[in-house]
């Protein structure tokens, strides 16, 4: 379990209350979103982002700029599952900010995105300023721009900085149904195991045109831990079994509607 439970503590949740809003102008070039989650027994997460697109008149090129901000707090709750389960754990208090610069040609045909995120909080807060997102933990669907397939700051509960370069290309005669996405991320934080971590992801997604919503998906992810990374479990290492170059491969078929 990602949360170790001590005797007498409670890591259950009675549910979540969520509220969100989104605005897009008539041109589709400006978009803003805001949402909030009240996680019972875990905290309150607030998130907002905005994107501006700059299409180049007379060409298929466009540029974009996006920014995001999030905060996770222990509002409306006297305690939470983490502080109850761990001796000396601090309250939830985390902040995240990020930017993304993008270029696209013919929408999905070619894309390049460069992004950076920083997560911080007081040293005496839970995880030194980590975000708590219990219902997306380990699902890799948290909205930070620099999320990688195998590592992101929310899932690992590790504040710090992340940098990401991502491209997208619609492959050949398959048209825009078969998308290839290479991704590179770099991690810079105060964690003795993951500081300097690098990850390369190669992702394929094919939307089967004959069946609307049916997709074939594949992912290859490889990480390189810093040669100086701590691999002592007693010191909180996350280097998996001393493996400094772990590989993850996944393939799936999924349907959305």
Question: Where are the model-predicted features located?
Answer:
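Flexible, surface-exposed loop regions and adjacent strand-edge segments
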Residues: 82-86, 129-138, 196-199, 233-244
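Internal metal/ion-chelating core segments
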Residues: 1-53
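A C-terminal functional module that forms or caps the active site or interfaces directly
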Residues: 161, 176-217
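Extracellular loop and loop/strand-boundary signature of outer-membrane beta-barrel proteins
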Residues: 3-7, 36, 81-88, 149-154, ...
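Outer-membrane beta-barrel "beta-signal"
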Residues: 19, 165, 243-257
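Solvent-exposed loop/turn segments connecting transmembrane beta-strands
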Residues: 11-15, 37-47, 157-161, 188-198, ...
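Detector for outer-membrane/organellar transmembrane beta-barrel domains
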Residues: 24, 29, 49-188
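C-terminal beta-signal and adjacent terminal beta-strands/loops
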Residues: 216-237
